[in-house]
Amino acid sequence: MAQNSLRLVEDKSVDKSKALEAALSQIERSFGKGSIMKLGSKDSVIEIETVSTGSLGLDIALGIGGLPKGRIIEIYGPESSGKTTLALQTIAEAQKKGGICGFVDAEHALDPVYARKLGVDLENLLISQPDTGEQALEITDTLVRSGAIDVLVVDSVAALVPRAEIEGEMGDSLPGMQARLMSQALRKLTASISKSNCMVIFINQIRMKIGVMFGSPETTTGGNALKFYASVRLDIRRIGSVKEREEVVGNQTRVKVVKNKMAPPFKQVEFDIMYGEGVSKTGELIDLGVKAGIVEKSGAWFSYNSQRLGQGRENAKLFLRDNPDLLREIEMALRQNAGLIADKFLENGGPESEGDEAADM
């Protein structure tokens, strides 16, 4: 019997560092320079670039100042909760920094007028309305591999219909086909996304599982692959309405960070999404200011540095809207107290909170 050429070297005199250098050089010759390196070396340490979500509170709750580039993001929630609005605000923030963005509209439901109101530059926004799920994911793969895209949104995973389902008869049962499609696509995409430093945001819908006795019956579409590959998962919910007298002018929204590979998860933040405007910056700054102790609240009155902002939240919002310099001053003070505010977000957002079971299923 031939003796195995590979054997464990037990001789203590063998220099381990030389053996390691030989192994590393062999790997680099086979797979190219940079295929393996020490994590702490100057060449390998890369600071994570982020893109703001358009919400200061959510940027703070994410722990790194926004959504990370070169990663997969999932935004999910019920209908009309603000999923597409949040994605479009992220695109608008990326475009302000000169980034190139794309929108794969699988639902064929993007409203360009609303997108423009949120600050999206439509002239420089790439949009595709594919016919099948395979086509949508192939377009996504091509755009990511180009290395020229900063933010790419896929709206939505539920609308990525496999070609076999479209070509088949209405009522045909094709179990697991969409999940297999997503699993294969994410296996291909994940390395390209990291190398190209492109952020890919998947918008997802919620479904109810039948026969669930304990825990939340909610689950997201497209199987479990996206839950594993996503670095950040955001659960967005509408929790109330914003009214001016009797007219509803916006939604009160809660976003929970149910998964975060970049910072501690389970933080949640609340803000207003105003119709035709997007995230209400003034309302959010007032709420965050009160939490951080920067804006004082006495009864119904709000004040900052002994200057009264208004009686009632809506009046204070109007005052700040008319005084942009004061608005910027409060925002700068809040950014300096970001660590304190982040701790406040954990008060109601532990892993035992309602709705987390849906993220774990």
Curated annotation (Swiss-Prot):
GO terms for biological process, alphabetical: DNA recombination; DNA repair; SOS response
Annotated InterPro entries: AAA+_ATPase (IPR003593), DNA_recomb/repair_RecA (IPR013765), DNA_recomb/repair_RecA_CS (IPR020584), P-loop_NTPase (IPR027417), RecA-like_C (IPR049261), RecA-like_N (IPR049428), RecA_ATP-bd (IPR020588), RecA_C_sf (IPR023400)
Residues that hold ATP according to the record: 77-84
Keywords: ATP-binding, Cytoplasm, DNA damage, DNA recombination, DNA repair, DNA-binding, Nucleotide-binding, SOS response
GO molecular function: ATP binding; ATP hydrolysis activity; ATP-dependent DNA damage sensor activity; damaged DNA binding; single-stranded DNA binding
Superkingdom of the organism of origin: Bacteria
Disulphide connectivity of cysteines: none
Location in or out of the cell: Cytoplasm
Any single GO CC term annotated in Swiss-Prot or TrEMBL for this entry: cytosol
Keyword match ATP-binding: yes
Pfam families: RecA (PF00154), RecA_C (PF21096)
Free-text function comment from the UniProt entry: Can catalyze the hydrolysis of ATP in the presence of single-stranded DNA, the ATP-dependent uptake of single-stranded DNA by duplex DNA, and the ATP-dependent hybridization of homologous single-stranded DNAs. It interacts with LexA causing its activation and leading to its autocatalytic cleavage.
Family, per entry: Belongs to the RecA family.
Name recorded for this polypeptide: Protein RecA
Organism: Sinorhizobium fredii (strain NBRC 101917 / NGR234)
Lineage: Bacteria, Pseudomonadati, Pseudomonadota, Alphaproteobacteria, Hyphomicrobiales
